[in-house]
Swiss-Prot record:
Species this protein is from: Vibrio cholerae serotype O1 (strain ATCC 39315 / El Tor Inaba N16961)
Keywords: 4Fe-4S, ATP-binding, Cytoplasm, Iron, Iron-sulfur, Magnesium, Metal-binding, Nucleotide-binding, RNA-binding, Transferase, tRNA processing, tRNA-binding
Quaternary assembly: Homodimer.
Protein family: Belongs to the TtcA family.
Binding positions ([4Fe-4S] cluster): C123, C126, C214
Protein name: tRNA-cytidine(32) 2-sulfurtransferase
Length: 310
């Protein structure tokens, strides 16, 4: 091995350690902020075979070793009998990790193919079937929490999807009770950036399983929103971080949802609420400081985005 190769290896290791530290820190912070994991929890980690769920399991196993509390992890994969699904990959990988796991075999593929007309997206029905099976499995395993691998970009994409197409400000919750009311669902990667996860996954060399084995058409609306956010991230560095921060800094008095704020009872004796109304004056938006790639950068006000032109 040449000195140049050794130096490159050292540089790669340094970058890997830095990236792993950031993902660990972001995951740990999300877990703490939302009280996702408690002492004695048994976490069912849903493993699809994609970069996000592999990274989630990896980081949770790492945090488990140093956490001040005790919790169990059990990795679960649903083999939906899609054609070409490599059944040996996940068992071999999970055996090598020494983590408890369960492979659930359910032929949902045949059901979906029978029920959904050719050419139509199968994702909605497939998702409902998968969700029901995972809920049942969590109960069988005695899991106290169900961990999903959605990251910060997924959460933002869902917010914009709901605003653009659903007419509501609704994202993807870091922690919430499942729709059947029986399980607590957590998203430990809620603070993690997709681009970090992609880099980390490449460095780790996970045995990624393709997500399009079913041949379903992609969700074009989500693809469009994803592309929009990626474009914004390139044109306006730090914009994604600021938008996600906005989800944690909601001011109901300055929106229009009367179920969240009692507008009807306001009179001149109500006092100034959250800075009050400044009439015809345009609000001055103070530049925000964001952290990106561990380098702190201040926004340039000249880059402010005119959303009316999008």
């Amino acid at each position: 091995m040449t000195a140049q190769t050794q130096e490159l290896t050292k540089a790669q290791q340094y970058n890997f350690n830095k990236l792993q530290k950031r993902i660990r820190r972001n995951t740990g912070q999300a877990i703490a902020d939302f009280n996702m994991i408690e002492d004695g929890d048994r976490i069912m980690v849903c493993l699809s075979g994609g970069k996000d769920s592999f990274t989630m399991l990896d980081i949770l196993m790492s945090l488990q070793k140093s956490a001040p509390i005790s919790f169990e992890l059990v990795a679960v994969n649903l083999d939906q009998k899609q054609p070409g699904f490599p059944e040996h990959v996940l068992p071999e990988y999970l055996e090598s990790l020494g983590v408890e796991y369960k492979i659930v075999e359910e032929d949902t593929y045949a059901i979906v193919q029978d029920k959904v007309p050719e050419g139509k997206t199968t994702c909605a029905l497939c998702s409902r079937l998968r969700r029901g099976i995972l809920y049942r499995t969590a109960k069988e395993l005695g899991a106290t929490k169900i961990a999903l691998g959605h990251h910060r970009d997924d959460i933002l994409e869902t917010l914009f999807l709901n605003m653009f197409y659903g007419g509501k400000m609704k994202g993807m919750p870091p922690k919430l009770v499942s729709d059947n009311g029986e399980h607590v669902v957590i998203r430990p990667l809620a603070y993690c950036r997709e681009k970090d996860i992609i880099k980390y996954s490449d460095m780790r060399g996970y045995p990624i399983i393709p997500c399009n084995l079913c041949g379903s058409q992609p969700n074009l609306q989500r693809q469009a929103v994803k592309q929009m956010l990626n474009d914004w991230d390139k044109r306006f560095p730090g914009r994604i971080e600021t938008m996600f921060r906005a989800m944690q800094n909601v001011v109901p008095s300055h929106l229009a949802d009367f179920s969240l704020f009692d507008f009807k009872s306001i009179d001149k004796n109500s006092g100034v609420i959250n800075g009050g109304d400044i009439g015809f004056d345009k609000e001055e938006i103070a530049p925000q400081v964001v952290e990106d790639e561990d380098l702190v950068m201040e926004f340039d006000p000249s880059l402010q985005l005119n959303v009316t032109n999008i």
